Amino acid sequence: MLFRSQSYALFPHLNVWDNVAFGLKRDGVPKAEMVERVEDMLALVQLQKFAKRSPHQLSGGQQQRVALARSLVKRPQLLMLDEPLGALDKKLREETQVELVNIIKQVGVTCVMVTHDQDEAMTMADRIAVMSEGRFLQVGAPSEVYEYPNCRFVADFVGNVNLLDGELTEDEPDHAVITSPLCRFHVGHGISGHLGMPVTVALRPEKISLSLQDPGQSHNAVACRVESLSYFGSYTSYHLKTLHGQTLQAWVTNTDRHHEHIEMGQSLWAHWQSNAMVVLDR
């Protein structure tokens, strides 16, 4: 196994080629094989024309690729990366994420990456493990962990979520009804629980739709007032307050420049589909 920490730890007195070759030289790899492996790795990370440059002459993203090449050229069975992109700015980090995944997949090495950046984990991982107090709480594909969290902690830890408490009042194979002071939740599947069981409904902000008109549904809808809003370009985040004092967060994608204009203090309806929720034990 090879471990690469947050620091690139490139040797400042060695050029790119010699940095990548360093481990092979120490292992006594024959020169012809070493040259071939280093050249192949520099081609893979697209740094052939920078082979004679010193580390200080490279950008942060290029230094990151040199450090990765130095690790991969030794052909480890397992590579562990600790916050590998933490030193890069946001835009470069996003660009490098895709490059890094492609390089690792081409080499065919198993990679374990430690990160506190959830966007980074979602983008790069085939499987994500959520840990708390030394225990694995859920392991699965990024979409599985995000869309179907198996407990309240995972739902709250991964991404943004509205956690709403209620009581199971109807449970059939094709649907369930959860009653709360907020509204009646109609879930599009059974949950195999006993009636009266306290549960928590997990509802992601992007699953909520907003309307200035009553949507005319007896469930999965609640009257709200806009407490605050934040414009992020591609979407707008709304903090809503219900008549019962419950706070909801909703994200609305700005697909149309001429969509309904919603302002602070305005009254509206929040509503969502029956398949938008995940029911968790409380």
Segments from the language model and where they lie:
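Short, small-residue-biased leader/transition segments that mark boundaries at the very start
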Residues: M1-L2
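Short beta-strand-centered aromatic/proline hotspots
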Residues: G166
